[in-house]
């Protein structure tokens, strides 16, 4: 369920500001989105896994806060990120 190093490098290469960027909000949101989608698939199979469901809700909340920050700082970056990730907002 955890992201492998190769998966992280691939995601950071696409969404980070540079190759080793791990701190920018775009990179963090992209990593959280991948983890959220993986957990969502897990919960489709294991409906009664309430510990993982709580973890999913925490990740969604963290992503929401980061997206709110990006929207406040730069709306163009926010819209670009939402479009590239395929989020509904």
From Swiss-Prot:
Gene Ontology terms for molecular function: rRNA binding; structural constituent of ribosome
Segments passing through the bilayer: none
Annotated signal peptide: none
Keywords, comma-separated and alphabetical: Ribonucleoprotein, Ribosomal protein, RNA-binding, rRNA-binding
GO biological process: translation
One GO CC term on file: cytosolic small ribosomal subunit
Database matches in InterPro entries: Ribosomal_uS15, Ribosomal_uS15_bac-type, uS15_NS1_RNA-bd_sf
Tagged with keyword Ligase: no
SUPFAM superfamilies per UniProt: S15/NS1 RNA-binding domain
PANTHER family, sorted: RIBOSOMAL PROTEIN S15, BACTERIAL AND ORGANELLAR, SMALL RIBOSOMAL SUBUNIT PROTEIN US15M
Stated family: Belongs to the universal ribosomal protein uS15 family.
Function field: One of the primary rRNA binding proteins, it binds directly to 16S rRNA where it helps nucleate assembly of the platform of the 30S subunit by binding and bridging several RNA helices of the 16S rRNA.
Oligomer status and interactors: Part of the 30S ribosomal subunit. Forms a bridge to the 50S subunit in the 70S ribosome, contacting the 23S rRNA.
Protein's UniProt name: Small ribosomal subunit protein uS15
Source organism: Mycolicibacterium gilvum (strain PYR-GCK)
Name of the gene encoding the protein in the UniProt record: rpsO
């Amino acid at each position: 369920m955890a992201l492998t190093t190769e998966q992280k490098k691939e995601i950071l290469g696409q969404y980070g500001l540079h190759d080793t960027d791990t701190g920018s909000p775009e990179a963090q949101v992209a990593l959280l989105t991948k983890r959220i989608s993986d957990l969502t698939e897990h919960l489709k199979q294991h409906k009664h896994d309430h510990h993982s469901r709580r973890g999913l809700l925490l990740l969604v909340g963290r992503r929401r806060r980061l997206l709110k920050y990006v929207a406040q700082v730069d709306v163009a970056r926010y819209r670009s990120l939402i479009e590239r990730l395929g989020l509904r907002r």
